[in-house]
């Protein structure tokens, strides 16, 4: 059984994301003094005592206004409560009861999910009890005074949360999920793709750029394998982004790339590859992440039997950083080839984690040398490649021992990398090669020997 879910519910700017960060001991949820910063529901891992659970942060609920994203935010909150064991309802103790709080209470009373009422911004325990007493009238049970920013009362609140969770013996050991980050420019269809993959409205979809302002974690299981999908805020040029929620969301997006096992880079089929797409491709390669390139909105392209081949050639010429990444033409709108994303991503992750024995590596290098010898300088010096070994995975990394790294130019280094890929595979993952000279190797050996003598 998956870990139980705790939903955080409340109107805008009452401190929901601050409480999430407090409960999860992190700063993943964006906190900013602008209402409506959180729009989609986002998940984090929570711990208390010997229990583990998922905390889902929802957007601020507003019932007297249907403009912009507010109806979708209400839908996201309703979906969060459907999967939750308990909903923690946050109100502002300093403001007292508002009409919005009463509307939320009415909304919650029609739901089967149990609720806990947390009165936030009660900085002192004595004043907190007096401030919280007013909220009995909401009909949501005992009000618990807390200060999310200082941690006052949050331990007692968590004790109450645990009473609503299913018994621990109903929870099984969970396999660590594969982290898959869905990244791309604004409005290329990342959230639509996430919803198509999950088969539900997990992320708010809108033609307005910047709808997603935070990273959104979604846990699903495909073919008995757990995945954690992260829909990220659209990444734009820094000079196009004002300081505020979108700025923080983009920083979260780069962090999502860093903590992912595989990135799905979404390209708009109508726009083709832009300069920003190229920068993202470079970031993925630089961070050493496995990758699948997904060309979305394929249904909107006028095409014949040669269009896909021609477009792939054009796209790959511009995404040369990711010439090793598989490319898939999809439509989030129609669902075309969406299921194939998992197969390609799973293969890329497998290759990203793969290790090869030293003997196999050197068989490939021997074959490469037989086809093309290292270059010779005008002075008659020729590069010599003695042997190689894999030193790391995630991404696969190899150290090649040579007489002098300076004798191996970029052209020959690319040739060796191609031969390693052709001989060993590694589709969907970058490969790192480290060229180490004989002098450096001997110096390291001498250092080790000296350390052994001293010990």
UniProtKB/Swiss-Prot annotation:
Gene3D superfamilies named in the record: 3.30.300.20, P-loop containing nucleotide triphosphate hydrolases
CDD domains reported for this sequence: EngA1, EngA2
Question: GO annotations under biological process?
Answer: ribosome biogenesis
PANTHER family, per the entry: GTPASE DER
The subunit structure is:
Associates with the 50S ribosomal subunit.
The UniProt entry, under HAMAP family, shows: GTPase_Der
List the protein's name.
GTPase Der
């Amino acid at each position: 059984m998956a870990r139980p879910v705790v939903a955080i519910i409340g109107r805008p700017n009452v401190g929901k994301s601050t409480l999430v960060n407090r409960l999860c001991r992190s700063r993943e949820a964006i906190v900013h003094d602008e209402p409506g910063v959180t729009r989609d529901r986002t998940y984090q891992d929570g711990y208390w005592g010997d229990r583990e659970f998922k905390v889902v942060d929802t957007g601020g609920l507003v019932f007297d206004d249907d403009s912009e994203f507010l109806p979708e935010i209400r839908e996201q909150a309703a979906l969060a409560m459907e999967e939750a064991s308990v909903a923690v309802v946050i109100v502002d103790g300093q403001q007292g009861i508002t009409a919005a709080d009463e509307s939320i209470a009415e909304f919650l009373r029609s739901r089967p999910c149990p609720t806990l009422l947390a009165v936030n911004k009660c900085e002192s325990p004595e004043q907190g009890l007096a401030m919280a007493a007013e909220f009995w009238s909401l009909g949501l049970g005992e009000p618990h005074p807390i200060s999310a920013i200082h941690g006052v009362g949050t331990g007692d609140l968590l004790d109450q949360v645990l009473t609503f969770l299913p018994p621990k013996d109903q929870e099984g050991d969970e396999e660590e999920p594969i982290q898959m980050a869905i990244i791309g420019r604004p409005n290329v269809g990342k959230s639509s793709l996430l919803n198509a993959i999950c088969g539900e409205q997990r992320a708010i979809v809108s033609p307005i750029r910047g709808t997603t302002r935070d990273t959104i974690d979604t846990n699903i299981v495909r073919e008995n394998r757990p995945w954690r999908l992260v829909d990220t805020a659209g990444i734009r040029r820094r000079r196009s982004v004002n300081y505020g929620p979108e700025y923080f969301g983009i920083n979260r997006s780069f962090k999502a790339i860093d903590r992912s096992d595989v990135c799905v880079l979404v390209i708009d089929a109508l726009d083709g590859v832009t300069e920003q797409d190229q920068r993202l491709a470079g970031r993925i390669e630089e961070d050493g992440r496995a990758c699948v390139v997904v060309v979305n909105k394929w249904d909107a392209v006028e095409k014949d039997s040669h269009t896909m081949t021609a477009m792939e050639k054009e796209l790959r010429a511009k995404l040369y950083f990711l010439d090793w990444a598989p490319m898939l033409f999809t439509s989030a709108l129609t669902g075309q080839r969406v299921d194939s994303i998992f197969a390609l991503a799973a293969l890329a992750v497998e290759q990203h984690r793969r290790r090869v024995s030293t003997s196999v590596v050197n068989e490939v290098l021997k074959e490469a040398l037989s086809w093309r010898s290292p270059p010779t300088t005008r002075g008659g010096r020729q590069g010599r490649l003695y042997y190689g070994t894999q030193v790391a995975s995630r991404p696969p990394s190899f150290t090649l021992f040579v007489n002098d790294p300076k004798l191996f130019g970029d052209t020959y280094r690319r040739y060796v990398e191609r031969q390693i890929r052709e001989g060993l595979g590694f589709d969907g993952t970058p490969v790192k090669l480290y060229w180490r000279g004989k002098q450096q190797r001997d110096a390291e050996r001498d250092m080790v020997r000296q350390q052994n003598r001293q010990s």
